């Protein structure tokens, strides 16, 4: 086994120069350094390990080192170089798997000062250097310090422009940290049987003897790194035109809002608490006041006649009277960009906030206001005006003006290469960033059709025929309920699963919760499964917290298998639990449930356990599904990539969007995805049949 790391002059898309590389070889126990002129020898050493059937360990290798080496070998040496997936271990992938609850375990290190705040919850190699006590400083910080001492100005990224010996030293230190991290990860007995020395085995033994989750996460990371490099073809012109339309509507709304809400006076500048006139008790709910020390109705007498009252004193022209409290105010013009102004006007119109920030301010966004209704038509019109403004502002932020706006992330190839963390959530779900492609508005949302249509295989023209590619969108059918049915089957002999496949599960749930409509039942069950509180559940039928609590109670009484499942989970996790001063104090047996692939899925609280179990099951099913789909397509002789037959563009929770060179290939992808999903169900002995639905079209609007 080799542990390695490279330094180069840029990120993957712009990298052109290999600076240095380091290998730690477990066979001789030595660190081997390779400078710019040794690039060929470095590649030879890696290839020799592959030929031996060995393993090469990088940190973030799947996403950076491995594809960067392929690119640099061609650029600098005109050499074909490809490391096979099965020969590569990524400690970043392992860290995210084994320490998915890192933020919980980092608190002690943060308090003790062992871990800097900027590294809290981070899986980066530098963060692990601090945790493991192997950190010897950070190259970028030291480089900046050196420039400062020399009186030179730092330009962002310049530390990677040219090779230097300090870089070589840090490269060695990175491998020291990677080795220490690897050994820490391999010592976890849950994932790696302790009787095997995993640093002294070939790749076949490593993958077959470690827990299945280790293999699943590495395969997913490899595939999703490929998806990132593929990118999602994007219609820049269409979104620029949409931006013009949205900006015009925003200007119109700004005028309407300012006219509708005008201006008002509000307290500002008071320095003292207002006290009750009779009791003298401070009244904190009232605005702060000022109590003048000077001023009056009349000025002091300035001659004998005024003192004797024969002549009136002059009027005091000062604005205040000494000892007479007043509330200072300011004149405010409505500002639609101010959340404080918006929530003030909404509450005046009759809106009662139910969701608050950590600091106690009402949360104001288009989603929170979606269901707000008041009886007064004028006030409702005012609320609707604000709702539309917030929605327009959100669309503008997503598409054009925000830091992570789509237009800011279109690469030179006309595609958006969104970042995916394959195990970003504690449940095993992926998370998305730069930009977040999981938050593209749906086709039923305002402007959703234009947004989705901009992402599409049709925007990629084939390099040979010049024809647009075809899109295949496939999603898992009713996954949440099928996962619930799988876990309920032990308690109801598969009755719930049978109803899903052969009956009408939403009508069954409607009757169980005694809800007025089938649509209410659909909203209820998904809210229930995702851990919605009593207040949220009550809102489904236009009521509050008490009604929500009652609906849950009825549902559990009439669906005893779910109640039994919840009880079973509680018994597995919790030794004892009691409520003290409104807080649940739990004595845990253990704080994790077993995922479908054997992993530990960490649970934050007992009431979230069922939701965690179901979300994890859905995430892992889809993860293995996308892996198996690609594997089966390749087995059919199809090539993955824009230079081949199909290209993964996005995986969002339970759906994949795949670009295909022809309609025939798109049909094959849809068929194979269904076969792969059935294979996953059989592989994990799922107690409810798993299915997919596929659509073929030109873009995401047509394929979801």
UniProtKB/Swiss-Prot annotation:
Residues at which substrate binds: 506, 518, 522, 526
InterPro entries: DNA-dir_DNA_pol_A_CS (IPR019760), DNA-dir_DNA_pol_A_palm_dom (IPR001098), DNA/RNA_pol_sf (IPR043502), DNA_polymerase_A (IPR002298), DPOL_T7 (IPR034699), RNaseH-like_sf (IPR012337), RNaseH_sf (IPR036397)
EC number, UniProt record: 2.7.7.7, 3.1.11.-
Alphabetized UniProt keyword annotations: DNA replication, DNA-binding, DNA-directed DNA polymerase, Exonuclease, Hydrolase, Magnesium, Metal-binding, Multifunctional enzyme, Nuclease, Nucleotidyltransferase, Transferase, Viral DNA replication
Residues involved in Mg(2+) 4 binding: 475-476, 654
A single GO molecular function term of this UniProt record: DNA binding
Binding site for Mg(2+) 1: 5
Physiological role: Replicates viral genomic DNA. This polymerase possesses two enzymatic activities: DNA synthesis (polymerase) and an exonucleolytic activity that degrades single-stranded DNA in the 3'-5' direction.
Binding site for Mg(2+) 3: 475, 654
Residues engaged in binding Mg(2+) 2: 5, 7, 174
Protein's UniProt name: DNA-directed DNA polymerase
Highest taxon of source: Viruses
Record field: catalytic activity: DNA(n) + a 2'-deoxyribonucleoside 5'-triphosphate = DNA(n+1) + diphosphate
Annotated stretches, region: Polymerase: 202-704
Subunit structure: Composed of two subunits. One is encoded by the phage and the other is encoded by the host thioredoxin.
Keyword Iron-sulfur belongs to the record: no
Region of interest: 3'-5'exonuclease: 1-187
Family membership noted in the UniProt record: Belongs to the DNA polymerase type-A family.
Cofactor names: Mg(2+)
Native species: Enterobacteria phage T3
Any single biological process term in GO: viral DNA genome replication
